[in-house]
Amino acid sequence: MKFTVNQKELLNNLLIVNKAVSNKNIQPLLSGIYLEATEDNKLIIRGTDMELGIESEVSAFVEESGKIVLPSKYFVEIVRKLPMMDLELSTEENSQIKIIYGSSEIKLNYFEGSEYPSIHDFEGECVLKIKGDDLVNAISLSQVVVSTDMSRPIFTGILLEIKNDKLNFVSSDTHRLCYTYIENIEKNVDRWESIVPAKSLKEVAYIIHEDEEIEIHITSNRILFKSGNIKVTSRLIEGKFVNYEQVIPKEFSTDINIIKKSLLDSLERAFVLTRDEIKSKLNTVKFNIKEKVLIISSRASEVGDIYEEIPIYLQGKEIELGFNGKYLIEILRNIDGEEISIKLNDPQSPGIIKGNQGNEKFIYLILPVRLQ
């Protein structure tokens, strides 16, 4: 195998593909990055941990085709530190690849590439086409309330559901739930449900080109994303997601509009006092909603108290209840827009947080906590 490739292009694509590689994998082959030089002057770069797979194509001048696997831990760092110039890579008979840059060279041991898992194109039973920026936004909103508890795997994923001409995204960590959606999608089915690992979607959001159309293929156990010269494939999570439509309240007795930054700043100040008591006190923040003001208070027994008033516009009843301040902070940091709406019923029932002023394509549901 012998080819010439630009250092910057090679590095950019290695950094993308390397997100699917685990250096802790007990199989040496899966701790590496697959390189294939093709006769039509392309360099195919691939990484996988058998759960997530990423493949990219780079233009190269190929003199001799071939395929090998290089240890990602060393290869990526070496390429990162090479000068920005054309690099010449060629395999030698002693299972080493020579990397020539200017008048210098580095040699690395490699594995044969014939046994490395492939990333097949497949025609999904469900095929979608959506805008890249819409997909990135939906993933960003959803992933903040995903569980890390592997004993309940469906909550470590995000539900992708086609229903009523929309692509719905639903996630939950059992304390909170997020619902958002994308309209104006091209699709070949009217109904579909799949649960995609949140960590896979996080990488998709990082990798894809936001200004491009994204093609998605889904089968019963895998999903494939195509964006420009990049393909990402992931296994799906087995199981049935919770009936989120039954969980989200439809009517409310209390509805407040509030400036998001004012609420977030206040909660972050309260968190400074209570963060060392999270495990024992659930980081509880009291909300006392009056006619024109939200009173936020919190107490840390060994640190002190906080009491703040924030102007609001209230429709409905006054109410007093508690929330986990950390959970609220994580949600608010993830919302764009100046103003939000918080809708409530009673101190034991879930409330919801929505955007205002045209930023209304999402709902966060959050459970209150019992006040001491």
Predicted regions: what they are:
Residues 1-372:
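Structural preference for solvent-exposed beta-strand-turn elements
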